[in-house]
UniProtKB/Swiss-Prot annotation:
The keyword GTP-binding does not apply. It catalyses: dTTP + H2O = dTMP + diphosphate + H(+); UTP + H2O = UMP + diphosphate + H(+). This is dTTP/UTP pyrophosphatase. It is found in: Cytoplasm. It comes from Methanosarcina barkeri (strain Fusaro / DSM 804). GO terms for biological process: nucleotide metabolic process. It is an enzyme of class 3 (hydrolase).
Amino acid sequence: MRQIILASASPRRKELLKQLIGDNFLVYASSYEESPCPGMHPKELLLKHSAEKARDVAKHFNSGLVISADTSVFFNGELLGKPKSSEEAEKMLKLLSGQRFLVITGLTVLDLDSGKEISELKSTTVWMDKISNEQISAYVRTGEPLDKAGAFAVQGKGAAFVEKIEGDFFNVVGLPLFRLGKILQKAGVSIFEEGLS
């Protein structure tokens, strides 16, 4: 079994990876600090952040596969990451209310043994119901939106606002499991091997 390292402190990504391959992986959070890159297309920026997180963590290991991801909401040509305050969360939710938008994840798998790096973008379309200002305020008070891209959690109370999803549901949570499973299997990881779960 190859060593797998998840380059993320996200409890949601940890749970998703566990769902796919069981407990046989390490979690090593990246210290890479995301910064704006003027002139870079938002989608390219997600790929850059994902790859840089993987490379940062890779410096601490000699062998194995490093998995990293960066997820944001893409609406009107802009990326909506995690809100920095309750006010920003409310603003994001008002913007997305009644709209169709994309949730995009930059996914990177870095093979430390071969040096091969795979970085891809995965997109999922989300339709959000119209949300009243009262609902938005009540939801923000729960604290749930404050560490979520686009200020909502489809796997939490935010599901009450999501009318429809087209594409990989797990991508909206933060890790596109279908595509990741394919990449891991190509790298020699048997996700169906006995003893992995």
